């Protein structure tokens, strides 16, 4: 039972944790919309449609590993609350090892798949989607690791770290999308490949900043972070798998329906314009859920 006198304190803690998470998620969703608008302005409606299709497919893959973020956050918050800092660090070290293996498997799998992954009535849309996806693919393994790290910082009550990393990375990402898709002149445009390359480079920047925060001497000493020979254990893996695996399949089933919605939109006669409209609608729906997601994360922590 929560005593009435504890409510203000709990509310302050929920706001302190939940508000940065909500803001960070909103900034990410807004940047996705701006990226698509830049692509559409510089490269046309077909490019917008192709990038929309590939970006949604990428999002399905990435959100499946949101399960790892939730699992890390759940384990770390409990271990941190019990002041078992070594176990909290072991949870992240083990999650990073799991994420590295899963990310490498995804990268290798999709090296052997062609444009047939992106089903559209017009081959031009499928080809543009595949071009974008191939240049964005290296970012997906890195994003799996980033999700684990975000879960760790949420679990120790430091979501502000995520916000401080996301802000400069997303600005750099949009600047690169603008530059690589024709902002510096049509003759220097890389087309949709430039948008995919911008995602990969900005993700590498973000991962580097997160690792820099983890590698600080005080963090490594307290939590034993980034010690993979001794910090990766079966004991740490068991709760991560027990929590994360059901959520993984839940995310796959739930979010694959979003991709199917995009595939259906890609079959109509004016498919490029339809993909534009459906993607914008999906982004607005996503943005509307972000406050609940942020404060739900705070409540779980």
Residue ranges and their predicted role:
Residues 1-21, 76-142, 172-175, 179, ...:
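Short alpha-helical transmembrane segments in multi-pass integral membrane proteins
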Residues 66-69, 73, 136-154, 162-173, ...:
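Short runs within selected transmembrane alpha-helices of multi-pass transporters and secretion channels
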Residues 19, 31, 35, 68, ...:
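Residue-level signal for transmembrane alpha-helical positions in Major Facilitator Superfamily
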Residues 30-49, 118-123, 179-185, 189-190, ...:
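Helix-terminus/linker motif at the lipid-water interface of multi-pass membrane proteins
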Residues 50-107, 146-157, 161-162, 277-301:
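Small-residue-rich hydrophobic transmembrane alpha-helices
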Residues 12-73, 242-265:
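Signature of the first transmembrane helix
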Residues 25-29, 63, 103, 136-140, ...:
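Residue-level hotspots within the lipid-embedded alpha helices of multi-pass solute transporters
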Residues 35, 72-73, 113-114, 149, ...:
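Hydrophobic/aromatic residues in alpha-helical transmembrane segments
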């Amino acid at each position: 039972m929560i005593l009435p006198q504890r409510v203000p304190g709990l509310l302050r803690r929920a706001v302190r944790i939940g508000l940065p998470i909500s803001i960070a998620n909103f900034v990410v969703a807004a940047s996705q919309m701006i990226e698509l608008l830049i692509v559409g302005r510089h490269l046309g409606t077909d490019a917008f449609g192709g990038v929309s299709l590939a970006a949604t497919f990428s999002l399905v893959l990435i959100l499946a590993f949101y399960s790892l973020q939730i699992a890390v956050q759940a384990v770390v918050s409990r271990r941190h609350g019990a002041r078992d800092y070594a176990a909290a660090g072991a949870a992240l070290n083990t999650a990073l090892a799991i994420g590295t293996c899963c990310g490498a498997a995804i990268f290798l799998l999709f090296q052997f798949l062609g444009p047939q992954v992106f089903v559209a009535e017009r081959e031009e849309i499928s080809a543009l989607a595949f071009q974008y996806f191939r240049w964005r693919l290296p970012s997906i393994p890195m994003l799996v690791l980033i999700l684990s790290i975000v879960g760790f910082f949420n679990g120790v009550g430091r979501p502000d770290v995520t916000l401080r990393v996301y802000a400069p990375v997303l600005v750099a990402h949009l600047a690169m999308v603008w530059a690589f898709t024709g902002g510096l002149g049509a003759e220097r445009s890389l087309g949709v490949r430039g948008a995919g390359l911008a995602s990969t480079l900005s993700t590498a920047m973000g991962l580097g900043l997160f690792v820099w925060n983890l590698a600080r001497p005080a963090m490594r000493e307290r939590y034993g972070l980034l010690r993979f020979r001794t910090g990766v254990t079966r004991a740490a893996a068991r709760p991560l798998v027990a929590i994360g695996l059901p959520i993984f399949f839940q995310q796959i089933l739930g979010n694959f329906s979003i991709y199917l919605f995009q595939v259906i939109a890609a079959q109509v006669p004016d498919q490029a314009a339809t993909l534009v409209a459906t993607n914008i609608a999906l982004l607005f729906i996503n943005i509307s859920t972000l406050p609940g997601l942020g404060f739900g994360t705070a409540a779980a922590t």
